[in-house]
């Protein structure tokens, strides 16, 4: 009954909406005895914006502790902090450790090099562009394309960086510290060659996948994957690792690192889970991924819900293979998105249970950090918006909201652990 009333836009029904929504948020899920819980699988907590820095300029002090408080007030229980480079992965490790006793959320992290950051495997002595980061692209496609030949002809620097990455993963893969939960964010991004070239992306996607197979400890970790406009190459690379293959060339001497692959044979563990996060592909792309393996799961956020075509694709994702995320501070749902129509239906009802957090411009936040109220920054996405993603997906798929939240929570915990 409440689902029907929530979709109504008739304000005369408001007196009925309040007790229904209040009951929904205070009750346990209809599908389980567990309370309402969200698990944000994509939180870029090391991003400069959460430390008050926008385009290289400091506007306010770091506010990520307040951000976590807001998330907890909106039923976010767990979050996966993403690493996009070796340095950022190290920062994620340190940040998760430093806020462990302060955070109302359980925070975990990934380790990996994003396709837009693979230039870091090129010799930094070749110039600042070689060490360009996710926040500072080279903006030079010709330069990016030149790096591949240099790296292959003189692989020693890349060998050292891959060993550094492998060592970092091994150091964190320890039974007494379970904050390291996934290898990633790794993959292919053919929309942003101004960050890195296709060939550099492909070779270091494969090398990182090889690293993930080098020993029994790492082979058990799920993969956190990125794919933009690259489905065919992405699937082809993953197919090789699912089937198993021998790398006789060993250009980067990975066989010296792990005893399990001293023969140069690489194959995913049959139970390994693969999460393609922030999915924005076509219906054809989706089917290729789902058909590749029953262990592939699809993560959706605001970027996955921009257009009517996006919504039609999300509708086709099996609920049991669906995960939710914000990819904060990016990928918010905007008024111009096709998905916003579904949020508008809920806004008045939602405000009965709890009003939306107020937001201010980034240059005004410093004055609000000591206030009792928790202020957001306009235009900056946060984990507290997980509910928005869930609402849109439940509407598009015509799945009961409580059931969707419960199912995605359980699926996420099976992959990354609770």
Swiss-Prot record:
Changing residue 327 to A: Reduces enzymatic activities by almost 95%. It is found in: Cytoplasm. Has both endo- and exonuclease activities. Incises double-stranded DNA without obvious specificity via its endonuclease activity and excises the DNA from the 3'-to 5'-end by its exonuclease activity. May have a role in apoptosis. The lineage of its organism: Eukaryota, Fungi, Dikarya, Ascomycota, Saccharomycotina. Its cofactor is Mg(2+). InterPro entries: DNase_TatD-rel_CS, Metal_Hydrolase, TatD-like, TatD-type_Hydrolase. It comes from Saccharomyces cerevisiae (strain ATCC 204508 / S288c). Optimum temperature is 30 degrees Celsius. GO terms for biological process: apoptotic DNA fragmentation; cellular response to oxidative stress. Optimum pH is 5. This is Deoxyribonuclease Tat-D. CDD domains: TatD_DNAse. Divalent metal cations. Has optimal activity with Mg(2+). It comes from the Eukaryota. A divalent metal cation 2 binds at residues 185, 226, 277. Present with 1460 molecules/cell in log phase SD medium. Keywords: Cytoplasm, Hydrolase, Metal-binding, Nuclease.
């Amino acid at each position: 009954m409440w689902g029907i009333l929530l979709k109504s836009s008739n304000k005369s029904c408001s007196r009925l909406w309040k007790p229904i929504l209040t009951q929904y948020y205070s009750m346990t899920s209809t599908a389980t005895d567990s309370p309402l819980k969200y698990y944000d699988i994509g939180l870029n907590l090391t991003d400069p914006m959460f430390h008050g820095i926008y385009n290289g300029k400091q506007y306010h002090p770091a506010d990520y502790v307040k951000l976590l408080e807001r998330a907890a007030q909106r039923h976010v229980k767990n979050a996966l902090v993403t690493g996009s480079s070796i340095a950022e992965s190290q920062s994620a490790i340190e940040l998760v450790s430093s806020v462990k006793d302060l955070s109302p959320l359980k925070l975990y992290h990934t380790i990996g090099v994003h396709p837009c950051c693979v230039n870091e495997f090129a010799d930094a002595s070749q110039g600042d562009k070689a060490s360009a980061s996710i926040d500072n692209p080279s903006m030079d496609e010709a330069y990016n394309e030149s790096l591949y030949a240099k790296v292959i002809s003189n692989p020693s620097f890349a060998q050292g960086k891959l060993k550094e990455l492998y060592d970092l993963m091994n150091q964190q893969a320890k039974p007494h510290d379970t904050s390291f939960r996934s290898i990633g964010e790794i993959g292919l991004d053919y929309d942003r060659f101004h960050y890195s070239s296709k060939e550099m992306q492909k070779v270091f996607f494969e090398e990182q996948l090889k690293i993930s197979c080098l020993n029994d400890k790492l082979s058990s970790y799920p993969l956190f994957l990125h794919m933009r406009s690259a489905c065919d190459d992405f699937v082809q690379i993953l197919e090789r690792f699912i089937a198993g293959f021998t790398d006789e060339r060993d250009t980067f001497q990975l066989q010296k690192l792990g005893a399990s692959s001293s023969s140069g044979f690489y194959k995913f563990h049959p139970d390994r889970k693969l999460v393609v996060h922030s999915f924005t592909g076509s219906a054809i792309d989706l089917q290729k991924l789902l058909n590749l393996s029953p262990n592939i799961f699809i993560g959706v956020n605001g970027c996955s819900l921009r257009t009517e075509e996006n919504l039609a694709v999300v509708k086709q994702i099996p609920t049991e293979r669906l995960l939710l995320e914000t990819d904060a501070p990016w990928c918010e749902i905007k008024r111009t998105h096709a998905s916003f129509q579904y949020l508008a239906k809920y806004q008045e009802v939602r405000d009965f249970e709890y009003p939306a957090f107020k937001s201010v411009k980034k240059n005004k936040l410093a004055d609000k950090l000591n206030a009792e109220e928790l202020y957001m920054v306009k235009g900056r996405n946060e984990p507290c918006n997980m509910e928005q993603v869930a609402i849109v997906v439940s509407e598009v798929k015509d799945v009961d909201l409580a059931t969707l939240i419960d199912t995605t929570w359980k699926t996420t915990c099976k992959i990354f652990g609770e």
